[in-house]
Amino acid sequence: LTPAQQQLLLQQAQAQAQLLAAAVQQHSASQQHSAAGATISASAATPMTQIPLSQPIQIAQDLQQLQQLQQQNLNLQQFVLVHPTTNLQPAQFIISQTPQGQQGLLQAQNLLTQLPQQSQANLLQPQPSITLTSQPTTPTRTIAATPIQTLPQSQTTPKRIDTPSLEEPSDLEELEQFAKTFKQRRIKLGFTQGDVGLAMGKLYGNDFSQTTISRFEALNLSFKNMCKLKPLLEKWLNDAENLSSDSTASSPSALNSPGLGAEGLNRRRKKRTSIETNIRVALEKSFMENQKPTSEDITLIAEQLNMEKEVIRVWFCNRRQKEKRINPPSSGGTSSSPIKAIFPSPTSLVATTPSLVTSSTATTLTVNPVLPLTSAAMTNLSLTGTTDSTSNNTATVISTAPPASSAVTSPSLSPSPSASASTSEASSASETSTTQTTSTPLPSPLGASQVMVTASGLQTAAAAALQGAAQLPANASLAAMAAAAGLNPGLMAPSQFAAGGALLSLNPGTLGGALSPALMSNSTLATIQALASSGSLPITSLDATGNLVFANAGGAPNIVTAPLFLNPQNLSLLTSNPVSLVSAAAASTGNSAPTASLHASSTSTESIQNSLFTVASASGAASTTTAASKAQ
């Protein structure tokens, strides 16, 4: 309030207090002080706007006068000023304590209620008035005057506070009922809350969000906003129902009417499909039989159940998703686990080879993915953990490679009277292995040379060889074994092998990590020895091209019998040219039986995917089984 308005309020309060004091004095004089005094106090309460009165000087003086009258007249009635907007008759508030004082009270009341009209002309509605009430209380009696916030006519009317009036409960009930009805009819028509907001935006130029419609239906908006939205939603609902009823018999152009807009009806929500219990049971049975039916199967099921094909298709899709949530597939794949195949056979692979260890029991062949197996027949190849020279009739490649990441099991071949068949299973991440050793006497000494490749990484595994290969039948083909191991059998044709020929395919990662760093390192060359019947064959020359040439120390006429071709890039050799290991070996019995050959070849400029070690059977014809691997 401005200072002028405050001054006006003070003047009005002073006038009211003076009128009250005059009325009390007149009443006291008419009664000739026959009644006892009463406490008359006028207190100006704070207005509604919480602005205190700054100059209550005159009121304080009037209060002092009233207190003096109180001491003189103790038995006067108590007068209370109540809110002027209360529509109550003054007679309801007057309780007379003495019959003599009732008439005087009514006269005083009339004097106080009839304020000068000129003072009220400057006030806005509601106009202030003073109503006298009497209450029998303690001798301490007060008269409380409550001024009302008033403004001159030149000032604007204060904004109405949104508080429910006496008539609003019925409006709230009506709004609640309308919101409930609106939601039901909207769902029946197939519109979403977002559709309603867009359609109302086209109708009234104001887009309403889906949240606003949702809050209206849930009665979460203010009363004022609910009242604003109700007529708009009511009009939209009537237009939607009229258009929906007319569109069934009218042309498609009705969809483009301005009542809803094309988006309104086009975005109708499809009704939820309800499937009966017996049909659901039949679908579950079909799902257990086949989780992914073809289009023909879905059509057949739809015809049997008298349902739409699309409904059946969607049900199967949803059911598969539910199955995934209930039974999630295991995260671990088979690529990291060993491949195991059992090959039971009571016969030996090569009956004429005396160095094979035969067994009639079924043997588990463990193949690690990083060391794929393409043929099960390993007759004369042994991977052991020794770094010393072996005995006669064995061509040895000795290396000091780092620990190998995998191990392959096969019968360990040695010219001793007893053959040690060791089974070693090692995972790709650990060298820990369980070794089972059995001893079987050999019927006759070895008649041809064998090739032994030694890696230090296999020392902890004792011996590594393909034991299960010995139990395969003699007519087992390379293609069958490769298919059993999950590999491509086209690496080498079985016709390239003689009876008992074998193929072991090593992954480049295995060779590079186990054999190549120590076979041909820059610091030291691996000790490579070719052994014949009369003793070991030392390295005689290393030419400029990197070819290693071995001489026959035993005087045998055979010079080149067991060549070895290795890729310099794949096996980290000294130069880019292939390195040939040429050795000579004679038969232990003096005859010129062919010795085993070990070949691995590829292009000298590109790394190979798989190095192929091939070993020819000692009892077969002299064959040079060379395999060229596919270049990357």
From Swiss-Prot:
Coiled-coil ranges (or none): none
Phosphothreonine modification, residue list: 157, 163
Biased composition (Low complexity): 243-258, 394-441
Alphabetic keyword roster: Activator, DNA-binding, Homeobox, Nucleus, Phosphoprotein, Transcription, Transcription regulation
Lineage top rank: taxon: Eukaryota
Post-translational changes noted in the entry: Phosphorylated by PRKDC.
Function per UniProt: Transcription factor that binds to the octamer motif (5'-ATTTGCAT-3') and activates the promoters of the genes for some small nuclear RNAs (snRNA) and of genes such as those for histone H2B and immunoglobulins. Modulates transcription transactivation by NR3C1, AR and PGR.
Subunit architecture: Interacts with POU2AF1; the interaction increases POU2F1 transactivation activity. Interacts with NR3C1, AR, PGR and HCFC1.
Protein name: POU domain, class 2, transcription factor 1
The gene coding this protein: Pou2f1
